[in-house]
């Protein structure tokens, strides 16, 4: 029999242990031996190993099949928590890089980031991040996340200002990841011309409405790459990398088919030569579920929730908003009751 304060991890206290000892002196009650969880499970293992009786085996994930709603309740907090974790990891890297470039890590500003991290950790409290706190808590959370983000953005702006090259028409592309990768970046530029890397190789570009997409290739891990813009009367003619035939789309990597509801009926991977979707299955299926559990509306999703599911099929807009050598974007909108859902599918 397990006893003690479980919620909060307090365990047993002196009074509980004394009460257990006194129970041994009450006539008629079975004698109970105090032990530990580790000792209990060691004996249980020996008992199960030596028994000839059938022992039930749990097959699957070991978790309490309860309070499933905490995985999705208050989605804003969950999204901002992860977004800020990643943002602060990048901001910390920037402060270290800036300190190294200045010749001293003592110049790496950490005080403001420490303040922000403490706010992030505060909002990871076990009743805040699951979405099970009272309304006023989440009003405070919005203010906290705004302050958290402001700190990191200021660090990024300081880093950019102190590391930017002074030469005109020159950009530095930083890669905070731990692996080398290609980056598709947006540069505010409306002039005609072309871009090159530091070796003079011409980079792929795509003109947007008020900016240019540039593919910076092989940006080193935890490092940077410099790209240059060369103005000229006429930029290099763009070659489209995408083919669109109604709801059939071909990219350099995929063949995609969409139905009249905006759902994928085919996704073929050209690189590996395989169908991603099983026969008869669909992708990009938007679903709505009734959220009225019997108890604990912020905590629970009842096991029968899938019986009250509706697909969103009223597609009201389908438009190609970007199409060029580097990027294709399809904008779709749906209507469901009094709600509107918009989606940009970028390939």
Q: Which functions belong to the PLM regions below?
A:
Residues 107-114, 122-347:
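Catalytic and substrate-binding regions of extracellular carbohydrate-active enzymes
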Residues 1-165, 174-176, 198:
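Active-site and substrate-binding clefts of carbohydrate-active enzymes
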